[in-house]
A protein has these predicted regions:
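Short hydrophobic alpha-helices that are characteristic scaffold elements of the AMP-binding
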Residues: 98-104, 126
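Conserved AMP-binding/adenylate-forming core of the ANL superfamily
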Residues: 23, 40-91, 95-99, 116-121
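ANL superfamily adenylate-forming
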Residues: 9, 51, 137-183
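Conserved ATP-dependent adenylate/AMP-binding module captured primarily in the ANL superfamily
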Residues: 113-143
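Conserved S/T- and glycine-rich ATP-binding loop of Class I adenylate-forming
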Residues: 84, 101, 132, 183, ...
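AMP-dependent adenylate-forming
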Residues: 4-12, 30-57
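Conserved pre-ATP/AMP-binding loop-to-beta segment of ANL
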Residues: 39-42, 170-195
Length: 198
């Protein structure tokens, strides 16, 4: 008698047709499933607390912030397939923008934060995002531009445009989340020449 081989993803069958409908869950769907399974486990940690102290957010705390930001993006007109760019240091805020953009149905365009501002501008011209979330060192430069995209901060140093300060009028529960065959991300890179490509 042959026994079925267990795989690391066997647990997904419990969530099929409830939390996802395609063959595999998308990144936001997988995040929501993980939150159901481990709501109080640590999800994101940073060291930006008082005196460099550690600040940890649980999956359920990040899920709340994700739903707030995805709802805010939807209220601001983001539709399935619109592009949102993000450039910054590794941080919970960066991860939140990535996940919330996908949950809102947008295509995320991460841009290497180590690039010079002119290189980032060229990549933004190629990507044509509706929103650009950027870290504190480069925020003033991009916020001062008269660009077609709106600029928001990954840093609390700019509270009026800080990602955690962006609150929706109401929280959506049915997001236009991308499906498994939809374009989720465009990885932009600067080449040796002046041409930028997606």
């Amino acid at each position: 008698m042959q026994t079925a081989t267990k795989t690391p993803w066997d647990f997904l069958s419990k969530y099929k047709d409830i939390d996802f409908s395609c063959e595999w869950p998308t990144v936001p769907e997988m995040f929501f499933i993980t939150t159901k399974r481990f709501p109080e486990r640590p999800c994101f940690t940073d060291f930006e607390g008082e005196g460099g102290s550690k600040n940890t957010l649980s999956y359920s705390q990040v899920e709340q912030k994700l739903k707030e930001l995805a709802s805010w993006l939807t209220e601001k007109g983001i539709q399935k397939g619109d592009r949102i760019a993000v450039s910054g240091k590794n941080s919970p805020q960066w991860g939140l923008v990535f996940l919330a953009s996908l949950a809102a149905g947008a295509t995320i365009c991460p841009i290497d934060y180590a690039l010079h501002e002119e290189e980032i501008k060229n990549l933004l011209n190629t990507a044509k995002p509706k929103f650009f979330f950027v870290d504190e060192e480069k925020f003033p430069t991009f916020d001062a531009q008269n660009a077609e995209y709106k600029v928001y901060s990954l840093s609390p140093k700019f509270p009026e445009k800080y990602v955690y300060s962006l609150k929706p009028n109401s929280i959506e529960h049915d997001f236009q989340s991308a499906k498994e065959d939809d374009l989720a991300a465009i990885l932009l890179q600067a080449e040796q020449q002046e041409i930028q490509k997606a």
